[in-house]
């Protein structure tokens, strides 16, 4: 057949039963009404489209699709056609057979990050219905496997949008590169009520037992977040007693727990009244609402199950600790015993003290719920209920039961603290650039100022680790950087645990409070001090909350290595689904930067698009920063230029042209290797670069080395040199290796606290452990960028390697040749389905959304090819939409021989465009007393067919 008929009909004018024999039909009498001439995307969840939830964009990007009827990979046909083209002839017993590169095809499919969870309806005529805003596209089941949605956020003329390559925006969000950061802060726990008991004139005095001394405050005054009472308390001039109270956020949850408690007490403590699963769900809800850092959700299923068993045990009357808790007299109460048993169960599950920073919601929620009743939980357990931590949980935590911990970490992006409220917060300053020479390089030097504390590597502790390293090789699970640092140790100090009321009810601040801590290896100076809330919470996260605090944009974040001293938040806010909403002010801030016009198509201060302004600027700026560091790490010498000076770090423009051409982080990684080691000033294709990284990360040693030797032979030779290091310059290659293993937008680390080896160019060269995902979930380049800043000068590079240096090389080679650190389990339903979510959200920040579905019509004769039939709205001209869709067929563009693009408006206006081997006519069709329009698609000389094209291609 040379003709293909597409009915365009209204069911009010003709029943579909008369048209159901057509492979494709368009029903126009079911629409979602426009709002202000734009699509009402808020209606997507209740429509048969794709599964995008009606939640905030932050929640939507972490959401797992729940209501869908299967998935579709938009570029699946493109991939399978390429695999078909690349088949190789193989001899077999049956003669010559053609074999497909199944491994490549599987990788290409798995590498797609634009999977669509479909919500479709199958009608009474077995047609699969794909709903659009202006119509419903009905496809026969035999042809439905190639149908997918194509969403496109429209260009805002004022913002000069360029919405091509939105994969880059998605990749930045996945690798935490599109996130701003704000300093960490602490405030008095909202689950505590601090009530004044006595006062003193100065900290030299002691509080006499039973004496209620009054100086400035009335006994019984509540300590709030500001005012004289707060000031005197944090100055350790007020003695307080603590009682629990319920924060507003969890009033309903605590009420439900108290109902269960009352039922349990009234039933004479019958354990059957305690339903562990229900308790665990309520406690998890509390833990999630009272989260003090914004981080990746933890999978708590296994731990939750253990917790439920512990709850069952503790509420049994025969349990020894249950008996002991009930044998304790006043001031113990039955109401308190309920929460005491919950806290003990949580502690046994954790096998240690539970803190507010616990990553598991159910345990964190158990602690907070108990605080609302008991005040300081572990102090009350010991003093009132005569229960103490078990010795086998660690002796160091038992003495802490004498203290009461009154401060908790807060997330300033989410905190509801009011202007004027007092907090304790961290200041975080980065070392600026310095001038040096090629002969000296840029090494990690300790140059502290007067009065500064210093955090650096302890030579004694490091020697112990080095001995273990030489004897047993690299231990990625047990080598920790914090274990070799001096005090105050920036990787372990925690104000929430270090500030407390001691046994004499005196408020104690840590020795490092209000002092600068300098750490040259982190290029940072930090200081924790008192502060004041200067602005109210706002929906836009670009909001510096503390008067002398800090907030940094995505382009600045890689330099901030110590993740526990700040919180991060994606530079998008508002609803995932909205007709029109405001974008973050961070993009206006970025547009004011001096290099913004150079790296984007905007003038300084322009109103910018979050993608073509924010995402492109972020990627390009970070790429230049990374390139600048790695150029200095080149193992090559600078003959004749040893005395030349340069400023480091500084961003040059030598590679700017190539970086402006990049579309993906994998291209940047390959370019760094190619430019520095291969002397190639050229850019690899994005698919080739992604494939290389995938193979390096996933293959074992022999194949991994083969891939490197083919892709980058000079780099491979330097890598192999690590087995026999001769000069210091041979070690430089080690710090390039994290690039290959720790960055990709669709990987997950095997464990987020494993450590990879990197060289620290200190006064003495050290091989140090860099944890890939610890400290507030750093990811990708943030985990190691800081250490790429240091590099040896030519004088150091020329030096012969000693035995320790040779060990560094061999240890690093053995680790990186075999590591599987990038092969953790990816949460595929979440990671792979977010491109359309971002497109729809971006449409609300720009000029709205255009939607369409794409249907593939196979052609069987005289040559095998495909024709694309696109049905969409009238927000785009049909020929423009045609070009957009065809451009996605990267591998198999030669097989797309024709396109039919049908546009339908809200008033049923019909426009059609055709190109290639196809022609079209719009005709009237009459059946009995009914009529409709049809798009008659003609292919002179060609015969369409092959309904099972996709099935065949996936099984070649």
From Swiss-Prot:
Keyword annotations: Capsid protein, Clathrin-mediated endocytosis of virus by host, Host-virus interaction, Inner capsid protein, Viral attachment to host cell, Viral penetration into host cytoplasm, Virion, Virus endocytosis by host, Virus entry into host cell
Pfam families, A to Z: Orbi_VP2 (PF00898)
GO BP annotations, alphabetical order: clathrin-dependent endocytosis of virus by host cell; virion attachment to host cell
Listed InterPro entries: Capsid_VP2_Orbivir
GO CC terms of this entry: viral inner capsid
Membrane-crossing residue ranges in chain numbering: none
Disulfide bonds: none
Major localization class: virion
Compartments, record wording: Virion
GO molecular function annotations of the record: structural molecule activity
Role according to the record: The VP2 protein is one of the two proteins (with VP5) which constitute the virus particle outer capsid. It is the major target of the host immunogenic response. Responsible for viral attachment to target host cell, probably by binding to sialic acid. This attachment induces virion internalization predominantly through clathrin-dependent endocytosis.
Family: Belongs to the orbivirus VP2 family.
Protein name as it appears in the record: Outer capsid protein VP2
Gene: Segment-2
């Amino acid at each position: 057949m040379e003709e293909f008929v597409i009915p365009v009909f209204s069911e009010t004018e003709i029943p579909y039963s008369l048209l159901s024999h057509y492979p494709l039909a368009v029903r126009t009498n079911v629409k979602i009404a426009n709002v202000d001439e734009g699509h009402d995307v808020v209606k997507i969840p209740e429509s048969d489209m794709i599964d995008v939830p009606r939640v905030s964009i932050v929640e939507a990007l972490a959401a797992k699709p729940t209501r869908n009827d299967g998935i579709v990979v938009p570029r699946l046909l493109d991939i399978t056609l390429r695999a078909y083209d690349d088949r190789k002839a193989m001899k077999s017993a049956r003669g010559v057979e053609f074999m497909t590169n199944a491994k490549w095809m599987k990788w290409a499919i798995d590498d797609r990050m634009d999977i669509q969870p479909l919500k479709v309806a199958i009608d009474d005529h077995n047609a699969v219905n794909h709903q659009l805003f202006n119509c419903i596209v009905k496809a026969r089941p035999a042809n439905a496997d190639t149908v997918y949605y194509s969403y496109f956020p429209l260009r805002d003329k004022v913002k000069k949008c360029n919405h091509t390559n939105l994969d880059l925006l998605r990749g930045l969000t996945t690798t935490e590169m599109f996130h701003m950061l704000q300093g960490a802060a602490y405030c008095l726990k909202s689950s505590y009520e601090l009530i004044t008991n006595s006062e003193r004139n100065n900290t030299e005095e002691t509080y006499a037992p039973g004496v209620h001394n009054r100086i400035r405050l009335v006994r019984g005054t509540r300590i709030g977040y500001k005012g004289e009472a707060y000031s005197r308390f944090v100055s350790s001039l007020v003695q307080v007693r603590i009682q629990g109270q319920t924060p507003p956020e969890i009033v309903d949850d605590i009420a439900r727990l108290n109902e269960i408690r009352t039922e349990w007490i009234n039933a004479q403590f019958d354990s059957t009244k305690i339903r562990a699963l229900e308790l665990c769900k309520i406690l998890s809800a509390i833990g999630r609402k009272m989260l003090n850092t914004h981080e990746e959700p933890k999978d708590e299923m296994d731990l939750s199950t253990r917790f439920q068993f512990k709850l069952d045990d503790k509420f049994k009357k025969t349990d020894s600790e249950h008996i002991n808790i009930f044998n304790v007299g006043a001031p113990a109460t039955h109401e308190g015993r309920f929460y005491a048993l919950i806290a003990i169960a949580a502690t046994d599950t954790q096998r240690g003290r539970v803190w507010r920073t616990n990553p598991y919601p159910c345990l964190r929620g158990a602690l907070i719920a108990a605080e609302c009743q008991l005040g300081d939980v572990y102090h009350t357990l010991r003093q009132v209920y005569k229960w103490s931590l078990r010795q086998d949980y660690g002796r160091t935590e038992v003495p802490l039961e004498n203290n009461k911990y009154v401060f908790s970490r807060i997330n300033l992006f989410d905190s509801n603290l009011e202007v004027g409220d007092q907090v304790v917060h961290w200041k975080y300053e980065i070392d600026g650039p310095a001038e040096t020479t090629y002969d000296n390089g840029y090494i990690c030097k300790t140059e502290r100022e007067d009065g500064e504390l210093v955090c650096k590597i302890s030579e004694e502790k490091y020697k112990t680790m080095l001995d273990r390293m030489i004897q047993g090789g690299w231990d990625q699970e047990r080598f920790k950087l914090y274990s070799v640092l001096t005090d105050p140790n920036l990787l372990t100090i925690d104000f929430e645990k270090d500030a407390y009321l001691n046994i004499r009810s005196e408020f104690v601040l840590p020795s490092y409070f209000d002092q600068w801590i300098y750490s040259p290896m982190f290029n940072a100076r930090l200081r924790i001090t008192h502060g004041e809330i200067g602005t109210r919470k706002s929906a836009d996260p670009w909001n510096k909350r503390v008067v002398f605090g800090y907030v940094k944009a995505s382009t600045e974040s890689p330099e901030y290595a110590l993740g526990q001293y700040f919180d991060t938040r994606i530079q998008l806010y508002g609803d995932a689904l909205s007709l029109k909403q405001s974008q973050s002010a961070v993009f206006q801030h970025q547009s004011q930067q001096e290099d913004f016009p150079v790296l984007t198509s905007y003038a300084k201060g322009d109103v910018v698009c979050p993608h073509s302004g924010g995402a492109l600027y972020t990627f390009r700026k970070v790429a230049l920063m990374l390139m600048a560091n790695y150029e200095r790490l080149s193992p090559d010498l600078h003959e004749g230029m040893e005395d030349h000076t340069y400023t480091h770090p500084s961003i040059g423009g030598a590679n700017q042209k190539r970086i402006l051409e990049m579309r993906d982080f994998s291209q940047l990684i390959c370019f760094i290797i190619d430019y520095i080691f291969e002397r190639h000033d050229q850019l690899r294709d994005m698919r080739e670069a992604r494939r290389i990284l995938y193979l390096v990360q996933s293959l074992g040693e022999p194949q991994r080395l083969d891939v490197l030797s083919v892709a980058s032979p000079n780099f491979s030779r330097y890598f192999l040199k690590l087995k026999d290091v001769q000069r210091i310059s041979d070690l430089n290659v080690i710090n390039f290796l994290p690039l290959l293993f720790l960055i990709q937008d669709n990987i997950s680390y095997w464990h987020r606290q494993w450590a990879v080896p990197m060289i620290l160019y200190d006064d003495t060269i050290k091989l140090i452990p860099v944890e890939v995902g610890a400290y507030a979930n750093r990811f990708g380049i943030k985990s190691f960028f800081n250490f790429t800043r240091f590099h040896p000068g030519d004088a150091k590079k020329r030096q012969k390697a000693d035995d320790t240096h040779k060990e560094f090389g061999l240890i690093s080679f053995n680790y990186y040749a075999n590591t599987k650190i990038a092969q953790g389990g990816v949460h595929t339903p979440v990671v792979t389905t977010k491109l359309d979510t971002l497109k729809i959200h971006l449409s609300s920040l720009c000029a709205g959304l255009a939607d369409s579905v794409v249907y593939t019509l196979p052609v069987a004769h005289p040559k095998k090819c495909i024709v694309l039939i696109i049905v969409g709205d009238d927000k785009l001209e049909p020929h423009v939409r045609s070009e957009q869709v065809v451009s996605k067929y990267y591998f198999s563009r030669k097989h797309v021989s024709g396109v039919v693009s049908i546009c339908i408006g809200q008033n049923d206006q019909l426009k059609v465009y055709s190109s290639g081997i196809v022609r079209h006519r719009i005709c009237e069709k009459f059946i009995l007393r009914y009529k409709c329009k049809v798009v008659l698609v003609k292919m002179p000389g060609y015969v369409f067919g092959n309904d099972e094209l996709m099935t065949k291609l996936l099984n070649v």
